[in-house]
């Protein structure tokens, strides 16, 4: 898959899974949040996501994919804490403000619709999108 070759050329895989705490002044809901420490070690974050449906948010795209910065053990806590769609969406916006990616790439060549994000039906869309603003990409 090319990962071994990339590491041999000097690429560094995310290995620091320490949980860190951050603060965001002016946050809508997530003034304090937890994230994975490797973000602090990165020269840049590039967000790769697959366009698909999501039961709570309607879809998973660039902005929602940044929920991936939250450590796995904390994700269920955040789903419980921000359990209505508007608060969950505000938390996603806060995370994107606190730890912004430099580039977002959306794979919408074949999306998924239906009971997302883990089940559904493949749907040919035929798009590959990239940009600096995750919210703009999500609106396209």
Where in this protein do the model-derived segments appear?
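Extended, low-polarity segments enriched in aliphatic/aromatic residues
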Residues: 1-140
């Amino acid at each position: 898959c090319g990962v071994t070759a990339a590491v041999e050329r000097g690429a560094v895989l995310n290995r620091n899974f320490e949980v860190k705490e951050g603060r965001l002044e002016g946050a809508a809901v997530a003034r304090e949040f937890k994230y994975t420490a490797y973000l602090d070690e990165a020269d840049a974050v590039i967000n790769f996501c697959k366009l698909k449906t999501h039961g709570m948010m309607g879809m998973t795209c660039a902005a929602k994919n940044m929920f991936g910065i939250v450590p796995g053990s904390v994700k269920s806590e955040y789903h419980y804490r921000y359990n209505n769609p508007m608060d969950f969406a505000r938390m996603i916006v806060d995370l994107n403000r606190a730890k912004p990616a430099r580039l977002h790439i959306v794979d919408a060549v074949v999306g998924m619709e239906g009971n997302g994000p883990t089940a559904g039906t493949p749907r040919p869309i035929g798009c590959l999108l990239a940009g600096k603003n995750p919210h703009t990409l999500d609106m396209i």
